[in-house]
Amino acid sequence: GEASHSESILRIETNRFASANLEYKLVMVDDDLNMVALPETRNIKSIVTAEDRLCIERKNKQAVQGLLYVRFICFGNGNLVAAHDDSDGFWRRQILITVKDRDPARVDNPFLIEELSEERPGILLWMLEGLHRLLANRYQFTISERSIQNLEAAMADSDNLTQFMQASAYVRFKPDTEERSTYLYRAYTKWCE
């Protein structure tokens, strides 16, 4: 509806006018998450935190300062990854939810939208129940063990240097040994291939 906006999360960081589309919106949906690492994360972190005024700029107009209350929902076959931000702040702002693989025997329901529309009152009650729980938890989401595992796996997957250092075929830690950085770098580049 009017309170939502469809956009690429990558565009929020790479296009200076993109944040203007999020003004007065409650949710932004990226329905096909680009697997390219985000070059920056400053805008996304500021929007998610919703405590800092941001520069909202429209083409051919004076930029203004404003608060954006939008929340991001990103769907994809991978995780949101930052090229240069490995801070806790980037990761702690994410809740990673996985879904079951599609059953090969599943038959798609062509009437799913109609059936869900009929269930709107029940879905609304379900959402209000979740809102009451969120308020009772002082605006802290309940994070499932699976979501914690998903986040830990995403963090490990994005940290290839640690993975390299744990690759025993390339790196061995023994007392009283040393190696030249050029040899270590060659081993790292070979491991990356």
Residue ranges of each PLM-predicted region?
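Feature primarily recognizes SF3-like P-loop helicase cores of small DNA viruses
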Residues: 1-193
